[in-house]
Amino acid sequence: MIINSPIGSAPTSEPDVTIVTDSSITTHKNPLFVPDANAEYVFELAPAVKIFRLGKSIPVKFASRYYDAITLIARVMPVIDGKPVRNGSAIYTAYDSAIVRGEWIEDLTKQTLEVTLGEQKMEINIADLRIDETISMLSKYFSMKIGDIVSPCYLPLSTTPVIDTRITASLSGCNVINIKVK
């Protein structure tokens, strides 16, 4: 489940959520095949956490008990009229390899994370991700299941995937995404 809002935004009572199918997610170990259907795509980073407990209607104060790892995901989105398409028809959000999931990091003790995408860098405060608030809000509408991936926001780091190049991203010095674009 992906929340379509920038970092630091508070979850709303009617969230803009994108549900992604398992077949749309590829791992950092597989190459990224850019679809032929559109001329331009953008590769945008977002933090994500892995749910490891079953839950419904989770209060904010208990939400941290439901996730045990963090990573970066990369959304590969078509660009239409100069803007990435973050939601809408499944043709834009649910095609094969629409999401590249990075390697999981189980150390959740850091308060600040450094994110890099190629030469771009930024530091994010864990509190700005609003993970607990997002899980609490989503659990009112959806059951949280073991293995679910929740992305609370997107980051202002993006690049254009170019065929026959590599895209790398790291989280606090750990290389979590290193993929070949085909």
Regions found by a protein language model. Name each.
Residues I146-P156:
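Glycine-rich beta-strand-to-loop/alpha-helix junction loops that act as flexible
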